[in-house]
Structures are given as C-alpha cells and as structure tokens.
UniProtKB/Swiss-Prot annotation:
Family: Belongs to the small heat shock protein (HSP20) family.
Protein name per UniProt: Heat shock protein Hsp-12.2
UniProt cross-references to PROSITE patterns, sorted A to Z: SHSP (PS01031)
Organism (species): Caenorhabditis elegans
Source lineage: Eukaryota, Metazoa, Ecdysozoa, Nematoda, Chromadorea
Superkingdom of origin: Eukaryota
UniProt entry keywords in alphabetical sequence: Stress response
GO cellular component terms listed in the entry, alphabetical order: cytoplasm; nucleus
Domain sHSP, first and last residues per copy: 15-110
Length: 110
C-alpha cells in the first residue's frame, strides 16, 4: 500500500463555495483520466490520508476536538473506490483546494 501526499492551496486565493446541488462527491472517469472530487472542508491536509492498495483508492479523514468535559466531538470520513483497470496507479495525485475540495486524479495507461 502506498500513501499519496496531499498538497494544498495557499489561503490567498478565494473561489465561490460549492452549491447545494453539487453533492459531496463527484467521480469522473474519462478516456484520459480518473478523477474524484470530495468535499472535506472541515479537515486540514494533516487530517487527510490518501492511499492506494492494489487497484483500490482509500481516503480517510479524521478531525477530533474536545468541546467540554463531557465528551468529544469528532468528524470522520472513510471512502474506498475501485480504480478502473486502465488507471496507472503510479500517477495518483491528490490536492486540497482552499474551498475544501479534495481532488484525486490519476492518468490512464497508454
């Protein structure tokens, strides 16, 4: 299993927020590339883990904060995607935009 580094935009750029009808996850599978877009606006790059295991893309996000003496508030997302057979797993890259969208892309095999 190999971990994929999550890069992030600097906070100096601003973009329109996602619209309500955009959904939480977008998956695009074209002849040229495979791409997943995931809304992770409540997580920092250090709280996001992206891995490839065989032909499976694994995404784990975890944010934990203590709110008071009575308990803990935590947010966690786990996603797994079967990569198409024609995806070159060595090209998987992830990027976190300032608006909170994690985009994971991979090229197709030639």
């Amino acid at each position: 299993m190999s971990a994929i580094e999550v890069t992030a935009d600097a906070a100096s750029t601003w973009d329109w927020p996602l619209q309500h009808n955009d959904g939480v996850v977008k998956v695009h599978n074209t002849k040229e590339k495979f791409e997943v877009g995931l809304d992770v606006q409540f997580f920092t790059p250090k709280e996001i883990e992206v891995k490839v295991s065989g032909q499976e893309l694994l995404i784990h996000c975890r944010h934990e904060t203590r709110s008071d003496n009575h308990g803990t508030v935590a947010r966690e997302i786990n996603r797994a995607y079967k990569l198409p057979d024609d995806v070159d797993v060595s090209t998987v890259k992830s990027h976190l935009a300032t608006r909170g969208v994690l985009t994971i892309t991979a090229s197709k095999k030639a």
